[in-house]
Amino acid sequence: MRVPCLIKWPGHIPAGQDRNGIQSHEDLFVTLAAAAGLPDLKQDLLKGYSMNGTTYKVHLDGYNNLDYWTGASMRSARREIFYYDETDLMAVRVDGWKLDIGVKHHGDWFDEKAYPSVPYITNLLMDPMERVTPDAPGFEYEGRKFFASKLWAPTGAGPFLAAHLKSLEDYPPRQGADTLSMKRAIDQAMRKLENAHGSSN
């Protein structure tokens, strides 16, 4: 989930700068719009904004990070990232902490999703490869002790999760994500077969 991004804008973005704050590809549109002269586009679209004869009232998930890019601010405007697997919220990151709400125990895309009773807690600054989890070999007393000492961490994500869920309520997604779940596809096919009076078309 971490990829490099190189930006060059002579006279505006200082050369040779490293920025390691949280950013997302979702931020690019809002930030580039600000650079093009529309710094309030995200807020305008929330209220309804007309472009080329069409009024759009939508929620953009991105943050305007132009001040961060230009050095006017040393902190990213974004503090949180939400991780989805198709339509399922699997994790949330706030600052250096990541909470895995849903997991795939073997780390493979093919794995069944599982939802532990307590989120897996990772400090990404200490463990950027996310190797210290309850599924990891050798996660014994010290791992459990660290995990237990950080059970306060999920409370920090609460306000971010609440705001995210409110945005989905106020601005429902226009199109849901499809799924590649074979179980779901088979269940749907079986329901159609069980409907003896249903159409065969």
Task: Label the predicted regions.
Residues 13-17, 21, 26-131:
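C-terminal cap/loop subdomain of S1 sulfatases and analogous C-terminal strand-loop tails that border
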Residues 9, 38, 71, 163, ...:
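A structural signal for alpha-helix termini and helix-coil/disorder junctions
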Residues 99, 105, 111-120, 124-201:
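Long, internal low-complexity/basic segments
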Residues 1-6, 118:
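Catalytic cores of eukaryotic secretory-pathway lumenal/extracellular enzymes that build
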Residues 3, 76-78, 146:
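Generic detection of intrinsically disordered/low-complexity segments and helix-coil linkers/edges
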Residues 4, 8-13, 131, 141-142:
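Short glycine/proline-rich turn/loop motifs
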